[in-house]
Amino acid sequence: MNEAVSPGALSTLFTDARTHNGWRETPVSDETLREIYALMKWGPTSANCSPARIVFIRTAEGKERLRPALSSGNLQKTLTAPVTAIVAWDSEFYERLPQLFPHGDARSWFTSSPQLAEETAFRNSSMQAAYLIVACRALGLDTGPMSGFDRQHVDDAFFAGSTLKSNLLINIGYGDSSKLFARLPRLSFEEACGLL
């Protein structure tokens, strides 16, 4: 049986963690980005399909390629973030299933149903984006996930000629707490959950 993590860890991962819009000028190393992936890759996905593909944008040149795709409200916080991750999904993720799920012919589940393949890739890459956020928090980083961007522009600018399609963006760095908004409420258990 697994042991519960400490209250301090729960605070870091969930209750005290915030979505950041402003950033300190502290760089995030490539080694730290590798550590993030080394943690997030263990999060569960359907048939271990692991459809997420991540581009970590760290350079001014990369940010300029991204700039035209950003909504006005997301522009400044993205350009000043040390790293912006494009979380994409591979529309042909199933080609890796003989490696990732060798227990049966899982590839055929998806080659026979393009709709199932797309739904699976999008849903599971979204789950993997959440794992990335938790991994960042576990390593002492802050994040700012965003869906306010032009997906087609991102796909054309970064994934043209490939099987990748963008899902969401996540700014990563060390947040400037002086730029946080007041914490917003969440739904109560009674409002969001049911017991049968």
Curated annotation (Swiss-Prot):
GO function terms (MF aspect): 3-hydroxypropionate dehydrogenase (NADP+) activity
Triggers of expression: Up-regulated by the nitrogen regulatory protein C (NtrC also called GlnG) and repressed by RutR.
Cofactor entry: FMN
KW Flavoprotein (keyword) present: yes
Keywords: Flavoprotein, FMN, NAD, NADP, Oxidoreductase
EC id: 1.1.1.298
Domain of life of the source: Bacteria
InterPro entries attached to this UniProt entry: Nitroreductase (IPR029479), Nitroreductase-like (IPR000415), Nitroreductase_HadB/RutE (IPR050461), RutE-like (IPR023936)
Annotated catalysed reactions: 3-hydroxypropanoate + NADP(+) = 3-oxopropanoate + NADPH + H(+)
GO biological process: nitrogen utilization; uracil catabolic process
NCBIfam families named in the record: PRK05365.1
Function: May reduce toxic product malonic semialdehyde to 3-hydroxypropionic acid, which is excreted.
The family this protein is said to belong to: Belongs to the nitroreductase family. HadB/RutE subfamily.
Stated name of the protein: Probable malonic semialdehyde reductase RutE
Species of provenance: Escherichia coli O8 (strain IAI1)
Lineage of producing organism: Bacteria, Pseudomonadati, Pseudomonadota, Gammaproteobacteria, Enterobacterales
